[in-house]
């Protein structure tokens, strides 16, 4: 089974998305990956974000980011 891939930038984790990643890591149906940089530097400086199956998803708070990630997955099923 192919799992959705959620990618985080280490710089953004330090800016606050760490909590979102920790919440998402508890979900066995997601593949969570950390990278040193995802090349979204301008947006990374402005908001919490993750790439969800390669698409940019953001949130004002870690909780909102988690909510937006799950919403994105519901609206964009892999199959």
UniProtKB/Swiss-Prot annotation:
It holds the Pfam family DUF1450. It comes from the Bacteria. Belongs to the UPF0349 family. This is UPF0349 protein GTNG_2908. It comes from Geobacillus thermodenitrificans (strain NG80-2).
């Amino acid at each position: 089974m192919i799992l959705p891939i959620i990618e985080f930038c280490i710089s953004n984790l330090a800016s606050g998305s760490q909590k979102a990643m920790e919440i998402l890591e508890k979900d066995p149906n997601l593949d969570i990956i950390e990278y040193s940089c995802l090349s979204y530097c301008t947006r990374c400086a402005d908001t919490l974000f993750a790439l969800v199956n390669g698409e940019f998803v953001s949130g004002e708070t870690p909780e909102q980011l988690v909510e937006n990630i799950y919403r994105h997955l519901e609206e964009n099923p892999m199959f």
